[in-house]
Every structure is written in C-alpha cells, then in structure tokens.
UniProtKB/Swiss-Prot annotation:
One of its GO terms (molecular function) is zinc ion binding. The modification N6-acetyllysine is found at K30, K129. It comes from Mycobacterium tuberculosis (strain ATCC 25618 / H37Rv). Catalyzes the oxidative decarboxylation of isocitrate to 2-oxoglutarate and carbon dioxide with the concomitant reduction of NADP(+). Cannot use NAD(+). This is Isocitrate dehydrogenase [NADP] 1. Its cofactor is Mg(2+); Mn(2+); Zn(2+). Coiled coil: none annotated. The record marks Y142, K215 as: Critical for catalysis.
Amino acid sequence: MSNAPKIKVSGPVVELDGDEMTRVIWKLIKDMLILPYLDIRLDYYDLGIEHRDATDDQVTIDAAYAIKKHGVGVKCATITPDEARVEEFNLKKMWLSPNGTIRNILGGTIFREPIVISNVPRLVPGWTKPIVIGRHAFGDQYRATNFKVDQPGTVTLTFTPADGSAPIVHEMVSIPEDGGVVLGMYNFKESIRDFARASFSYGLNAKWPVYLSTKNTILKAYDGMFKDEFERVYEEEFKAQFEAAGLTYEHRLIDDMVAACLKWEGGYVWACKNYDGDVQSDTVAQGYGSLGLMTSVLMTADGKTVEAEAAHGTVTRHYRQYQAGKPTSTNPIASIFAWTRGLQHRGKLDGTPEVIDFAHKLESVVIATVESGKMTKDLAILIGPEQDWLNSEEFLDAIADNLEKELAN
C-alpha cells in the first residue's frame, strides 16, 4: 500500500450502497481503490433492499436530498422489487425503483456513456470513441393518455386556457366502424429547456459536440418546440463557451442521425426525446459490446449536481454463487467508473485538480489493465475462447497493483 499522503477531497460525496453481488464488489472497490488513496468524507446511505424496507423507503428519499445538498452522489446497483423479490425478502410492499425516486427529487437528465477498451470487440467496430445518449426522461408516450374505441365516432383535442379565453379545439379524426386507438401526449417548454441545458452542460464537461434528434418535419409544432428551444438555449447560454472550446451543436432528423451514428466513430452527446432515448440507449449499449462497460450519470440542468452509477443490475446469478462460497468473475468496471465520475465532479465543484487527476488515472489504469490481458470472464468471452480471465478479487488486485505503480510515477 502506498505511503504517499492521501489526496484531500474537500467536499463530501454521498455514497449509496446497493444489493447482491454489486454490493460485495462496491465494498471491495471502496476498500482497495478509493479509501487507501483519498482523504474523503462519505455521507453513507444503505439502499440495500432490506434497509429500504425497514425505513419504508425513507432512506432513498434522504439520500436524494443529501445529493441535492452536496452536489455529488455515487450509487451502487439496487434491486427494484417485483412479486418474486417481495416474497424472497418478505417485504412490506413492492417499493418503487430507487433510481426513479432519486430522479424525481433531483430532476435532470440521465446520460449513458460506454467505456471503450481497444481489445474488447464491438458489434460496431467503427465506434472507437463513446457515444453518450442523453434521454429526456419526461412526457411524450410515457405520460400519455391512450385508449381503445370499438365503435365509430369523433376524436377532438381541446385546450382550455386558464384565463377563461376561448378554447383551442382540433377535430383530429373520425374513427370508422371497426374502432381504433387514440393517443394524447404532451411536453412542457420548461422541461425541454432544462433537458437542453443538461445536454449542453454534459457536452461542455466532456468536451464533445452535441446533437439533438427529432422528427420536426412531421411533428412541426411538437418536435418543432424541441428544435427551437434547444436552438434558443444554445444561442443564449452556451454558444460562446462551445465556440471557445471548439465544440459544435447541431439538430438532425432522427432517421438521418441513426444512419450517421453507424458511420461515425463516436465522441459526441446525442440528445434524444424520451422514446428515442429508451430505444437508442439499448442499441448503443449493444453496439459497444457490454452493459458491464456502461456508466450512467444523472446531471441536473444547471450542471451542478451529478449522481453516477453503473448502468447494469445487481448480478443476482453471481451472488447465488457467492452465497454458496464459490468465487465469481464479476465485472467491476462500471461500478469503478461510478466512483471516478462522481470524484471528477467533486473535484470540479471544489476546484481541486488533484482529485480530478486521481479519477482520470484510475480510469486509465482500469482500461490499461484490461488491454494488458487481465479481465473478468464476461469480457474474455467477448474476446474469444483463448482469452484467460480472473475472478473478481484477482482482477481488482491487478487494478490496485497498477494504480499503485501509476500513482508512484
């Protein structure tokens, strides 16, 4: 272990513990890669399913407000209970997704960013840099009213102004004999503007250009508002900073963007409407080869608050092996990057470049360790049958050794 003085992290980091195999790995990461090198104040919340149940989920709410207060959270993967989990843990009720609860309290946009490692094959080999998908997690199909009708009739859309002035009425369609389906959806200008701010803040931070995709040629008013508000926020609030950093912003049609993304090498932020983001984030994750190499960062519109976590689940299958006393080969990379992304933001808020530098070094050490042929089983399988692999602790040992060397330089 290093005898060098620990690097001081000025502000606190809110730590959200989780479940199953990721909880085991999370503690190893903290004990082997974080605490030996950093003098850090951790504001700890146990979001393990039993503790959420014991506190009636109050711990999740408290954790979210702590992140709001301190500006940085790092989160371990958690169980979102279904019927089987309610039975397994004898839960009082089927608690909501902690991620949803935290997002509702903090607001903001979720950005999913792949970790690119040169010797891990990608389904899309040309993607040599990350594509970051920012998904507008509000409105559209996800807050829509939709229903079925089984007889002929008329569908009308009515907007009734709050000031009592004349309503706006659109007769949409006459439904024929056989019936059909109807969908009414909406979005709010303020939410779109906040989404734009978060997307531009992320781009500025990562030093990558930003693209927004819509279908404004068809939805002239609806998607037109996304296009116009992004343009306005960019011109008024970000253009000067973008140009100074040599960055660009562009709106593109969704079909054009999907085609372009397959041709381009990556290295940009792709701001997607709610449904597009839902679909494209999974397409992109698969294209890079592994959810085990995908980080997820929630960033608020003002760019001041960040919560980082791995984009994968709690790895239940490995946890069952672990409970049986067998070694597992669980990929810790996305969880390590949750720590590093949180630390980078903490360093930025505090004005402590040495903290940011430590986080960057840890990231490059992780990538270099895999590129040197040391990795967990999931990555070895992607490379091929000849590739050796390490168990979880051996891989973390290899990273710790390499980090030790890197920091000594």
